[in-house]
C-alpha cells in the first residue's frame, strides 16, 4: 500500500470563524469634568478589544479589535480637544480584518486608564485621567565623564 500526500492550499479555519463580524458604528471623544477624558467605541455586538500602552517620549494607548467587517466612514481620525489626549488615529487592515486605534497622550504625565464595556448599549469606554497621587518621573540627568 502507498500513501498519498496532498497539499492543503486553503486557509485554515480562523478561531473567529462563525462569529458575527464586528461593525463599528461610532467612535466619540468626550472631555469630562475633573480631568477625565473618555473615548467611546460603539459596536454592533459585545466585543472585548485588546488594550495596552506604549511608554516613552511619545506615549500611546493602543486598542486592537479583531474580526472587524466595517467602520462608519469618516472615522480614520477623531477630533479631540483634550488636555491629556493629543489625537486619536485608526487603521483598518483589510487583509486581517483587524483594526488598530492609537490614542496619543501627553508626555511627562502619569495616567490612570480604566476600561468598561456597557453590554446593553454595546459601547466600550476607555477612561483616561491624570494620576495625581504620584508625580511624573523626572528624566535622569546624563552622567558627566
Question: Which residues does each PLM region occupy?
Answer:
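Short linear recognition/processing motifs and adjacent strand/loop elements at protein termini
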Residues: 1-145
Amino acid at each position: 500500500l502507498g500513501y498519498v500526500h496532498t497539499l492543503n492550499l486553503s486557509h485554515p479555519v480562523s478561531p473567529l470563524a462563525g462569529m458575527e463580524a464586528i461593525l463599528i458604528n461610532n467612535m466619540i471623544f468626550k472631555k469630562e469634568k475633573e480631568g477625565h477624558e473618555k473615548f467611546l467605541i460603539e459596536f454592533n455586538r459585545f466585543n472585548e478589544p485588546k488594550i495596552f500602552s506604549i511608554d516613552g517620549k511619545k506615549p500611546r494607548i493602543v486598542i486592537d479589535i479583531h474580526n472587524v467587517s466595517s467602520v462608519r466612514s469618516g472615522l480614520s481620525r477623531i477630533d479631540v480637544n483634550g488636555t491629556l489626549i493629543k489625537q486619536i488615529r485608526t487603521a483598518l487592515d483589510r487583509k486581517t480584518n483587524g483594526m488598530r486605534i492609537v490614542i496619543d497622550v501627553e508626555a511627562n504625565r502619569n495616567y490612570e486608564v480604566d476600561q468598561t464595556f456597557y453590554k446593553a448599549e454595546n459601547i466600550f469606554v476607555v477612561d483616561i485621567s491624570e494620576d495625581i497621587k504620584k508625580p511624573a518621573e523626572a528624566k535622569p540627568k546624563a552622567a558627566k565623564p
